[in-house]
Amino acid sequence: MATSDSIVDDRKQLHVATFPWLAFGHILPYLQLSKLIAEKGHKVSFLSTTRNIQRLSSHISPLINVVQLTLPRVQELPEDAEATTDVHPEDIPYLKKASDGLQPEVTRFLEQHSPDWIIYDYTHYWLPSIAASLGISRAHFSVTTPWAIAYMGPSADAMINGSDGRTTVEDLTTPPKWFPFPTKVCWRKHDLARLVPYKAPGISDGYRMGLVLKGSDCLLSKCYHEFGTQWLPLLETLHQVPVVPVGLLPPEVPGDEKDETWVSIKKWLDGKQKGSVVYVALGSEVLVSQTEVVELALGLELSGLPFVWAYRKPKGPAKSDSVELPDGFVERTRDRGLVWTSWAPQLRILSHESVCGFLTHCGSGSIVEGLMFGHPLIMLPIFGDQPLNARLLEDKQVGIEIPRNEEDGCLTKESVARSLRSVVVEKEGEIYKANARELSKIYNDTKVEKEYVSQFVDYLEKNTRAVAIDHES
């Protein structure tokens, strides 16, 4: 295996195994982290299922050893479903059930190869105890923001038992008592209603996360100290485990300018004035209603702003739901709007000089990508940690959340249009633009990013179980 000059000769080469959850929003950061560890001269084994590995072929570094796993069949899933993109959100619990069925194969790998470290995702609640019994050091790498993890519960035991003391709507819509500082990070009433479609029989995410946190030697956070000043120490206090920031792992803009999809979109963007276009993308796995899509579309129309909408037909709250754009919308906005209905090269679009703002669902990956390019955010969070992310970002004044009806979450075209214009046109938006530009300097500081990676790998080198045993003997 190729090695990097950055590892000192007298240090042992580690074998690190990484095992993400079956969602590309998790798989890609895990793959990126694996590559960075390998570039420091360590052996890395990346574990995922066969079909996902095939779909990753263009992303996999030759430095990484790929371990293909066979996902067990689960009756409720389509035959080739191996990632969250392959299923409706209400079927994700069955994908987790299938993922749990990987336990025997992963255990055999650990027994046969004895890695020094195993880095795993929140879903793999069964893994820490197995790794511990084999003398393997254990780390949970969270792609979820640290404030969202802290919001889940005051301790791993509380998460496991489902007993964090929050029993009323008021409890859930105010910052929890274990937050020792003022913050706006909390759900609102309409956010709670959105959690219901995602609940299903089986093992809860809180139980999974609690066992993962309780069984880990450390927690790896996709964050900077500068952005998680209060939150990283809070996580250490709540869970009594070292929290190691690994940096933001910002993705690289692809270099192939001849990609047919990008050529078409770029031609359209090139025809627009610099700093005039809003990019709209709500992710490919969120549940949105027909009413929300209509109000969002009509709000874009009402705003009068040029836009590119990455509109991969959204999934409705039920599998039978059909979600459509309003009649005549595409034709009426054809001169200033581009509705792109297949996969869109998000990084390239955000990097184009005509783009001036990003209407986003506030997934953690999209936040990084938007702020990398200094774009203020117009935030439309849908579920889970997305509302928590939006509240924190609004508090940091890098954008605003589109107002909804507090009780039922209803969206209006007027609130969409007003929010868009407030951020990218009106004078009040200057503060959001300035703060987003300042954050982009941090997000694009390659020296700082490399320092985080070096410190993280140094932590792995100094804190393996083998090192601890050597020190004791």
From Swiss-Prot:
The keyword Transferase applies. It catalyses: steviolmonoside + UDP-alpha-D-glucose = steviolbioside + UDP + H(+); rubusoside + UDP-alpha-D-glucose = stevioside + UDP + H(+); stevioside + UDP-alpha-D-glucose = rebaudioside E + UDP + H(+); rebaudioside A + UDP-alpha-D-glucose = rebaudioside D + UDP + H(+). The active site is at 26 (proton acceptor), 121 (charge relay). CDD domains: GT1_Gtf-like. Its EC number is 2.4.1.-. One of its GO terms (molecular function) is UDP-glucosyltransferase activity. An anthocyanidin binds at residues 26, 384. Keywords: Glycosyltransferase, Transferase. UDP-alpha-D-glucose binds at residues 344, 346, 361, 366, 369, 385-386. It comes from the Eukaryota. InterPro entries: UDP-glycosyltransf_plant, UDP_glucos_trans, UDP_glycos_trans_CS. Involved in the biosynthesis of steviol glycosides in leaves. Converts the mono-glycoside steviolmonoside to the bi-glycoside steviolbioside. Converts the bi-glycoside rubusoside to the tri-glycoside stevioside. Converts the tri-glycoside stevioside to the tetra-glycoside rebaudioside E. Converts the tetra-glycoside rebaudioside A to the penta-glycoside rebaudioside E. Leaves of the 'sweet herb' Stevia rebaudiana contain a mix of steviol glycosides, compounds that are unique in the plant world because of their intense sweetness and high concentration in leaf tissue. Stevia leaves have been used as natural sweeteners in South America for centuries. PANTHER family: GLYCOSYLTRANSFERASE, UDP-GLYCOSYLTRANSFERASE 91B1. Belongs to the UDP-glycosyltransferase family. This is UDP-glycosyltransferase 91D2.
